[in-house]
Amino acid sequence: MALFAAWHANAEKEPNERVVVAYVTAGKNDVPDPTVMTHINYAFGTVNETFNGVNIQDPDRLKMIVGLKQQNPKLKVLLSIGGWTAGRFSEMAATKENRSAFAKDCKRIVEEFGLDGIDMDWEYPSSSEAGISSSPDDIDNFTLLMKELRHVLGQDKLLTIATICTAQYIDFKNCLPYLNLVNVMSYDMSDPNKQHHAALYPSPISGYCTGSEAVEAHLKAGVPKEKLVMGMPFYSKGRRQDPGIDEFLRTGVLPEGYSHQWSDEAKAEYIANEKGEFVWGYETVRSLSAKCQYILDNNLRGGMYWEYSSDKTGEFRTVLSNMLLNSGPDQHQKRYMLQL
């Protein structure tokens, strides 16, 4: 109890500065610019085969990422454990012995690599949607896992989680005291053949959930704004089997009859076919600027994106950096914002 009380009191004193969280993946050769984000979540580590430790994908790349702190000493680097189809969580969290051993291995990795903390991306407790094992006890066991991780990591390390847009599968009331940030995966929120997977607001082209609805779901679940981080995708998604989209993805040229569209209702960019139907959703400076403005208007903690290397030109991450961390949008972004 003393450790928890001390950590909670310390957390109350920490300044709630705006954050930009970038997921940076293994298996790539790019070197991230450490000046355009506050946090890097390195993806991924996984639960090991004996349910009591962590395997790290491409540990040499993780070492390189940590080395970026020399250029930006304020940069926080975390190991993200999990990801879609990453299993063994249910078995690991099921027993006190496994939870304790797993948490101790996380601490070993944090100390060995010089990390600032751990990000947990279990998709999802009590769900086998991703083809992983699950149990009705997972939600309670997840809370126990967060408690153990906080106890073992101590009060000076970061503990964050990634969550589904609907705020399901997590007992936030009991988890939140142990967490620094909640990264909401406000993308993949539709049948991509029919709707935009990451619209900001409800509209005819929006999916079953939107960015604004994801935020509201988490606020309703009790997540305070100072811990709430809204996710954004740096990738496009849609009706891949559509012949016009197939041609577009191969050549970069839209066939006759297809057009780029902006939904002012959804604050989202998309491609429509010759019938005016949605076929492909994507992000632009304009749509990301709208999401950043939403974060600012609603006083959320910040923005998160998946993932760094998908932004080939760097203009997407520059939007988040300028709007959320610096003085505001540059002239290029202002031109789009006048249309919002």
Predicted regions, residues:
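N-terminal signal peptide
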Residues: 2-15, 295
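Glycan-recognition patch characteristic of GH18 chitinases/ENGases
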Residues: 12-110, 197, 204, 329-337
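Short, well-ordered coil/turn segments that N-cap beta-strands
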Residues: 17-18, 36-38, 73-77, 114-116, ...
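Substrate-binding surface in catalytic domains of secreted glycosidases
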Residues: 21, 49-60, 104, 125-257
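Structural recognition of alpha->loop->beta junctions
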Residues: 33-42, 98-122, 173-189
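Solvent-exposed, polar/charged alpha-helical surfaces in well-ordered, non-transmembrane soluble domains
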Residues: 35, 63, 100, 104-112, ...
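Conserved, mostly hydrophobic/aromatic
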Residues: 40, 79, 120, 149, ...
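Glycan-binding loop/region signatures in secreted carbohydrate-active enzymes
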Residues: 81, 227-294, 319-340
